[in-house]
Amino acid sequence: AELVFAAVKESRENDVMSPDGVEEFLDEVAIYDLEAKTDDRTDFYVAFYSIEAPLVGFCVRSRLGTMFPLLDGGRAANLKFEQTGVKFATPTVNKINAFGEEDDVAGRMLMIERLGGILKYNDVADKVFRSNLCMIDLHFPRMLGEMLRVMHLDGISKVSGLIEAIKQINPLKIKDELIHKHSYYEYKMKQFLMALALGMRPAKIFNGIDSAISGFLFVDGNGEILCYQKADRQVFADFLFVNSRFEKSSTEKDKYGYLERENGVYYFKLNLKIGLLKR
């Protein structure tokens, strides 16, 4: 080390000749390549510990009790679909809205299709939530809208399963390379789930800054306690992706699942609610 340091110090060139004895030493200790054969671009790892470090906040989620959702629906979490195709008369709209039980959202969606109507994604009902979603990606609201459609019509609720369906549908019309090599849809969903876990709410302006929540203490079905924290962001995001699902909230409470007229146009709203798997 002293020989190398002296040679570097004395040279004014970027390339320095290896001092006598250095090559022999490297051969003796069987070091033949000084360049790391890995994608890890770090030089070394350091952990800092301090008694002055501030306390950090954690949320508790337990499969043994009530599992509070990551996103608790609400009217601000409604996404709007414009009814296009056939123009329905008022009696037809009334017939559609009266179809099935109150929570038979899929039944009313299918009836619209049978009668020649098309539900085309339009917008997020709440402007604050729209902006929050656009912080993930400008096209992310459309992706969520298609995931909601798949949940209701195909009965898929797990986030990982919904993403597999979305990769086949490709609602954003992106290139296959982005879908499969870059895992675009998985990446965007993980970003969103992390934002929800760390404080994003539909009706509160989100600027990308995390709240006081630093992670989850998760109690599994056997009573084991697992810790997920934003310091290990990839592990946390993977956990959320595998263990999250879309849920159905109350149609009456959150005002969705029916054709509603706005400025002469009919819209059909779907509600976004996301929770953790109970099993």
Task: Please annotate each region the language model reported.
Residues A1-R41, A47-R279:
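Short, positively charged
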